[in-house]
């Protein structure tokens, strides 16, 4: 994923990024993410087939069906089962970020998110191994 942010210094940010992706034949290999809806809208206008993810701390219901967002990345502490279900109902995927504690990882998994974004891959691997064991044991007993 390439996260795009406006800083006020850039000129034609979306066009420049898209040109680079096209030059390196990477349009189908990348996901463009942003907290800025305008950036995602512009990317979809320029290249309708590009994958996009709307990144947010939290979501309002009217944001569940953004035409220019193929998926969502929501701060894990703010995810709810209802939010994930509503986004899935719209045919879109949901990722939780930034899960750097097992508590946040558990919340993201329990909400039914499609993926986890973390800075601590080892902790996530350990967490997932432990969760798989618990689920396996629970199904036996």
Which residues make up each language-model segment?
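Short loop-to-alpha-helix "cap/lid" segments that border enzyme active sites
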Residues: 1-141
């Amino acid at each position: 994923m390439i996260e795009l942010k406006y800083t006020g210094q850039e000129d034609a940010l979306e066009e420049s990024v898209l040109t680079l992706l096209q030059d390196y034949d990477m349009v189908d290999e990348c996901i463009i993410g942003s907290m800025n809806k305008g950036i995602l809208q512009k990317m979809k206008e320029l290249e309708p087939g590009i994958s996009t993810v709307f990144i947010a701390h939290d979501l309002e219901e009217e944001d569940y069906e953004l035409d220019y967002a193929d998926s969502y990345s929501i701060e894990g502490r703010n995810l709810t089962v209802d939010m994930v279900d509503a986004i899935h109902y719209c045919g879109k995927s949901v990722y939780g970020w930034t899960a750097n504690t097992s508590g946040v990882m558990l919340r993201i998994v329990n909400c039914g998110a499609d993926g986890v974004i973390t800075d601590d891959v080892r902790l996530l691997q350990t967490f997932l191994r432990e969760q798989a064991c618990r689920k396996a044991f629970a199904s036996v007993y």
